[in-house]
Amino acid sequence: MSFYESVFIIRQDISLNDIDKIVDDFAKIIKDNNGTIIKKEYWGLRTLAYKIGSNKKGHYYFLGLDITPNVKEEIERKMKLNENIIRFLTIKADAISSEPSPMLKNQSTENNLVIDVTINN
């Protein structure tokens, strides 16, 4: 098993319930293949640097994963096929930090939000 960090952007018109369903679909694939989601972070609805299709904003979501390369390929394939996901990037990591990501820390200080990080050990 290897550690991966995956960030994906979901269309701005998708509800939070539908976002949870998308993440749950990925979680099912990971669990069925003996992988683990170590950390999940919702970074919120953010303005994109440039317009992607008709989207000026997108819901950003981060996953810290402990999975095999085959599972990574399957998740990326599902992301490509999902029309609600407009961009994604998955990178290999040495480890997954238990601390909130810099994006989440920055968002919480700007908006006085409570940081919500789900960590599974």
Swiss-Prot record:
Protein keywords: Ribonucleoprotein, Ribosomal protein, RNA-binding, rRNA-binding
Gene Ontology process terms (BP): translation
Keyword RNA-binding: yes
GO MF, one example: structural constituent of ribosome
InterPro entries, alphabetized: Ribosomal_bS6 (IPR000529), Ribosomal_bS6_sf (IPR035980), Ribosomal_S6_plastid/chlpt (IPR020814), Transl_elong_EF1B/ribsomal_bS6 (IPR014717)
Entry keyword annotation includes Nucleotide-binding: no
Disulfide bonds, paired cysteine numbers: none
Signal peptide (from-to): none
Gene Ontology CC terms: cytoplasm; ribonucleoprotein complex; ribosome
Pfam family, one: Ribosomal_S6
Function: Binds together with bS18 to 16S ribosomal RNA.
Family as reported in the entry's similarity comment: Belongs to the bacterial ribosomal protein bS6 family.
Protein name: Small ribosomal subunit protein bS6
Organism name: Rickettsia canadensis (strain McKiel)
Lineage: Bacteria, Pseudomonadati, Pseudomonadota, Alphaproteobacteria, Rickettsiales
